């Protein structure tokens, strides 16, 4: 019978690797808590209309990449390809603006896109997102960018590049699209196939083309910065000024447009600079029309998302995980000893000791060997002799010293045991 394997583009995150995920998650959640951002969790599947209306029907995500299906009730369902649309749907549905006019939110979880799997890119992947809903102020844009940069700096990632652009408002882009289309039409036959299709439907998306020949053609194309309204110019200038005040260097990239239609004004990407080139690990921008577009009252917002697989690839070497060890390993032999061991396990769990009980029924020599493999600080030994004398043996594996105490004494020695474990764990040789 053929083995059942994980679907292409998905990956098991095994215990040795999950430690790094947990480390990053804990680090980021603490930082965001300090900035008074609240965690929010939304379903991983939504009505497909949410993404048709929110992301845009002319985008690659909606046209090529969504996992879309009809359920048993014939509802059109999509596994979420990104997080912002679901957050906005929740914001509207749960009337969150009635509770607080400003919402600082963050989320983390799996997303799904049918893309070609490669290093750092899977069909099921994970994003952590930051959303600031309710403010038009340029300080909101700058705060979101500052938080993203702070996350990377806290993970000892410093060789970063922040690309920044303003794509203006809908009215600005409408005028710009005409000028850009007129320019690119002259080079229609020289454009890549995708760009030829976009020339009619959404020419601004051509700026994001990865085709080298198309990029050469774009060097002389009109720049969106020349078509911004005074309001958009002022907003972008304010964002740049705040970033300077925050000592965050940036590079203005006039071709940066992002891949989602809901953005306006500020758009940005954060890339890592390595010997192998650049890799985008964070992208975001302002989306002032999305709440209204999805049926809510017009509400400004700005946010970003970080690709966790990509982040892990570059941050892993900088993460110094604490030693994997346990406090007590419980070794028993015999029915009565097993019963006593289970009772001690329960008590030590309640006192928040990290423990493991051996259930192999091996001899004590093998059980103690296993305790050493698990890097236990101490091994609690309970055999026929201990049962007969009404005691347990604690063998401190670091020093090889051991002591005999009763179960009652154990229960009154929690503070002493915690201090001793801390002493051994803090030893340089441990």
From Swiss-Prot:
The protein's enzyme class: ligase
Q: What are its GO cellular component terms? A: chloroplast
Q: Please provide, alphabetically and separated by semicolons, the GO molecular function terms listed in this UniProt record.
A: ATP binding; histidine-tRNA ligase activity
Q: Which residues form a coiled coil?
A: none
Its GO biological process terms?
Answer: histidyl-tRNA aminoacylation
Q: What is its main location?
A: plastid
The record's listing under Pfam families reads: HGTP_anticodon, tRNA-synt_His
Does the keyword Cell wall biogenesis/degradation feature in the UniProt annotation?
no
Q: List the subcellular locations.
A: Plastid, Chloroplast
Q: What keywords are annotated for this sequence in UniProt?
A: Aminoacyl-tRNA synthetase, ATP-binding, Chloroplast, Ligase, Nucleotide-binding, Plastid, Protein biosynthesis
Q: Which CDD domains match?
A: HisRS-like_core (cd00773), HisRS_anticodon (cd00859)
The catalytic activity, as recorded, is:
tRNA(His) + L-histidine + ATP = L-histidyl-tRNA(His) + AMP + diphosphate + H(+)
The organism sits in which domain of life?
Eukaryota
| E.C. number | 6.1.1.21
Query: What Gene3D superfamilies does the record point to?
Result: Anticodon-binding domain, Bira Bifunctional Protein, Domain 2
Q: Which family does it belong to?
A: Belongs to the class-II aminoacyl-tRNA synthetase family.
UniProt-listed NCBIfam families: hisS (TIGR00442)
Matches recorded under HAMAP family: His_tRNA_synth
Q: Could you tell me what this protein is called? A: Histidine--tRNA ligase, chloroplastic
């Amino acid at each position: 019978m053929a083995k059942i394997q994980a679907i292409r583009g998905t990956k098991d995150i095994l215990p040795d690797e999950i430690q790094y995920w947990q480390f990053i998650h804990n680090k980021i959640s603490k930082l965001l808590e300090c900035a008074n951002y609240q965690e929010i969790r939304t379903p991983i599947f939504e009505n497909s209309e949410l993404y048709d209306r929110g992301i845009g029907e002319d985008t690659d995500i909606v046209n090529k990449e969504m996992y879309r299906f009809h359920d048993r009730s014939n509802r059109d369902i999509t596994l979420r390809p990104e997080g912002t649309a679901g957050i906005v749907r929740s914001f509207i549905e749960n009337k969150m603006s009635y509770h607080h006019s400003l919402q600082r939110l963050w989320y983390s979880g799996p997303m799904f896109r049918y893309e070609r799997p490669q290093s750092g890119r899977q069909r099921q992947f994970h994003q952590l997102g930051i959303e600031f809903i309710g403010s038009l102020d340029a300080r909101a844009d700058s705060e979101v960018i500052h938080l993203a940069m702070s996350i990377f700096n806290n993970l000892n990632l410093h060789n970063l590049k922040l690309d920044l652009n303003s794509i203006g408002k809908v009215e600005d882009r409408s005028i710009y699209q005409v000028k850009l289309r007129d320019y690119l039409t002259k080079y229609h036959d020289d454009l890549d196939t995708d760009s030829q299709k976009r020339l009619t439907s959404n020419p601004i998306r051509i700026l994001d083309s990865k085709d080298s020949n198309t990029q050469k053609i774009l060097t002389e194309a009109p720049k969106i910065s020349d078509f911004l309204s005074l309001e958009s110019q002022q907003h972008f200038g304010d964002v740049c000024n705040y970033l300077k005040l925050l000592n965050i260097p940036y590079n203005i990239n006039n071709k940066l447009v992002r891949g989602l239609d809901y953005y306006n004004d500020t758009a940005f990407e954060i890339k890592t600079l390595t010997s192998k080139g650049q890799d985008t690990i964070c992208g975001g921008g302002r989306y002032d029309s999305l709440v209204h577009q999805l049926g809510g009252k017009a509400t400004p917002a700005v946010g970003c998302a970080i690709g966790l697989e990509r982040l892990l690839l570059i941050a892993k070497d900088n993460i110094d995980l604490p030693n994997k060890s346990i406090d007590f390993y419980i070794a028993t032999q015999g029915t009565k000893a097993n019963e006593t061991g289970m009772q001690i396990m329960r008590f030590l769990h309640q006192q928040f000791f990290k423990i493991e009980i051996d259930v192999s029924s091996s001899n004590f020599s093998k059980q103690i060997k296993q305790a050493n493999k698990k890097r236990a600080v101490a091994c609690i030994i309970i055999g026929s002799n201990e049962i007969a004398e009404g005691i347990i043996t604690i063998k401190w594996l670091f020093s090889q010293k051991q002591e005999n105490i009763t179960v009652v004494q154990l229960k009154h020695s929690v503070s002493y045991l915690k201090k001793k474990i801390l002493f051994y764990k803090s030893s340089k040789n441990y």
